[in-house]
Structures are given as structure tokens and as C-alpha cells.
């Protein structure tokens, strides 16, 4: 049997985190990952599936996806209020591909690819998401990130993934802005993904 879950071993000192759920290690990871792929802003999430869900939420559209793809993609598209259309396309395997085009921006699925400055190949208003599932180039304890040069879009993802609350380092300073979701990346996820990101160039 092929061992797909081949991760580096780490000992995580939970006492070193300033917050177990959304500590400064998450922000540190977001910054380093954005610097690596050439994007200005990023929001780390508990999974790439949640990035698909939030990016397509209530768009009321039909999204074309390859027939050879994990079911979580179709699930997220459907659960976000859209329809799925399947196409016989295998060119996406091992690379990134356009998940959907809107009038003024596109969504790029790059769960299979992480390379330096790759976001610069696209428009500043585009959204690109990555997966940190254990089998991915930057494997981790699951997790994902969505990046863009469009700060307003990323700020919305940050609020939506943190229960719909305005972002603040201090819990009591946050205010509920709209009904959101608990989809943020936690500190342990960020720690493992960050260590493996720093090893990516050695692969």
C-alpha cells in the first residue's frame, strides 16, 4: 500500500502558543505563505474545502469541475448554493486550474501546486486557494489558505471564518457583524504547515 500520509515528525509545545485557536503563529504563517506565493494578503482556514465554500457562497451559478476530483470539491460547491457540472479534464492533475470565472475576478484552485510567486501569474483581484491536507506539497494537519492582492476580499474571509466577527487580537474587542462560520485555522495547524513550508524548497 502506498503511504500517502508521509509527514515530518514534530513535537508541538502548546504552552508556547499565545492562543491555542488563533494565535500569532497563524498570522506568521499567513505572512510567510503569502510572501512565498507572491500575494499581498491571505486568510488561513481550517480546510481548503472551506475556502471553496466561502468563495462560492450564494453565487447561484454553475461551476464546471473535472470528473476526476475529490468529492469534497463538489460538496462545497453544492453546499454553498451552486450547481455542479462535470467535464472530462485531467490537465489539472498536479497543477492549478481555474475553478470559476466571474466578470471581474477568477477563483483558482491550487491545492496541488505551491511555487514561488505563482500568484503573480494572475490578476490582483483573483482569489487563489491552497490545501495543507497531509498529501499536499505543504502537508499539515489539514487546513487551507485563500490569497489575493484584494484586501477587502480577504478581510471578508477573515470575518466570515471567525463566526462573522470583526477581527481583533483581543477577544473582547470583536463585534459580531453577520452570521458567520467557525472555519479559521488553529495554532497547531499553522505551526505544522509553517515548518513544512520552510522545508518546501528542499524537496
What are these regions (language model features)?
Residues 37, 123, 139:
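Structured loop/turn residues at beta-strand edges in well-structured enzyme cores
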Residues 102-105, 123, 127-129:
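Internal catalytic-core helix/loop-beta-alpha segment
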